[in-house]
Structure formats: structure tokens, C-alpha cells
Amino acid sequence: MEKLGIGYDTRHGRKVVAQDICAHLQRGELTCLIGANGVGKSTLLRTLSAFLPPLSGEIRLLGKPLVEYSPKKLARLLAMVLTHKTTTDNLTVRELVGMGRSPYTGFFGTLTTEDETIVEESLRSVGILALQHRKLHTLSDGEYQKTMIAKALAQHTPLILLDEPTAFLDYPSKVETLQMLRRLAHELHKSIFLSTHDIELAIQLADKLWVMEESMAAPLPAKKDAGSHLVVGTPRQLADDGTLSRFIERDGIHFDTASLTIHISTK
């Protein structure tokens, strides 16, 4: 992203959410986007996934402007996992994951032997091969989320974007999901980018954090760009420069920069 401006049009005019954002995603890394409600995380994610056009600046993917890709070509480079569930509850797990191959199949969507192999590898990568014949409506929230991640893997894209993938999961499933996404980013050399409100898990498991905030007073070594709403760095960098303390700490809530943990006062 180079000098990116994000926002959207409303009945009352254009709403500018953030401007002059400069950042990049690396392959082989898990990057987590965190920030307060209403600060613009969803708008940024929708802009990165080409659902919203940028107001200014440029997004480049593999060195080429995002707007120059056709929808079919973009679907081979970028996979998106949304929070809401699909309405195709009568599909099986394997059938839904197979839909991830649609950018590569012909008009009728017939899967080749190679496609079927990729589907099976994707199911195995997230640990749900044994669930492949289950109907979607029989799955738990955690199993369903794994199915959607497997579908994204089946697209064989270098970039996967996820909108709050742990939002409706219990705590053990949240941990398992983020651990799995970190592993997939590292093992498959993918860039995996997600928004989340699970701050402490993101701090512990992300390779990089993108923190959206209204104040841009954070110093180096964390990367930042004056005028944007985004501070980028490793969890350690953002702890040392005060970004995480500024974002997390309130009355009764303390962020320990040494251990990267959050402590809540009981008094």
C-alpha cells in the first residue's frame, strides 16, 4: 500500500476513514489488524480485498496495481474468509472446499484429479479430512471456520484475508485457529492477514501487527507514516515504542511490555 486513502460514500457525502497509509505484507507471515470499534478495520480489509475502491493511493499485489487484475485472475491471488456463514447448508464440507477451485475450473466447475488432490490436501492441512462428508449445518462454529479456511487454501493464493475469524469461537478454538493460521503462513509461505478483537492472542501469535488508532504519536523503531491511522511493527517493537500500551491501557487495565501480557485489576 502506498499513500492509501480509504473510506466510503454515504447519503451525506464521502466518509474518509484514513489517509496516507503505507505498509506491506510479507509472505510467510501472519499479520493481525487490531484497533478500537469504528476506527476503520473493516473498511481497510474491504479495500484490500477489492470490495471497496481506494479513495487515493495504490494497492499493489505482486508488483502490479490491484485494479489491473481481472476478477478471475484476482481470485487466483487473493482469498477472502468472511465472518458470516454461507446459506448453502446442504453442501458437504468437501463440496464447499471444492468451490475454492472455481477460479481454475471450466464453465461447469468440474474438478480434475489434480483439483481433488488439492481439496484433500486443504482438508488435511486444517485437520478436518475426517469431516469431509458432513453437512455444513451439522458443524460446530470451530469446524465451520476450519472449513472456510480450507476453502481459501484450495484457491492456492499467495494472500489470504480473514475478517475476524475467531469472533464466534470459544477460547480454546480461538487459540487453535490462530495457531493454525500462523503455522499455515509459515509452512505454506503464504501471507495471511486478519482482523481481530482478540488482542492478547494476536500479540502472542502474530509475526506483525497493524494497529489502527486515531493518534499517530508513536516513535520508531515501529514503522509509521504521519497522517495515517496505522502503526505497523512486530509485537515487540510496538510494545517497546508504547503503541500497545496506548491502545490497551485504561483504568484497571495494564499492559506489561516485558511479558507482552495484559493484566486486569480486581480492585
Model regions: which residues?
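The feature captures the beta-strand-to-loop junction immediately N-terminal to the Walker
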Residues: I34-A36
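Helix-to-loop junction immediately C-terminal to a conserved catalytic motif
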Residues: S49
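ABC ATPase nucleotide-binding domains
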Residues: R236-D240, R246-K267
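Catalytic Walker B motif of ABC-type/P-loop ATPase nucleotide-binding domains
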Residues: I160-D163
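Conserved ABC ATPase signature
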Residues: K135-L139
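H-loop/switch region of ABC-family ATPase nucleotide-binding domains
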Residues: T196-H197
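Conserved ABC transporter NBD signature motif
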Residues: G57-P65, L74
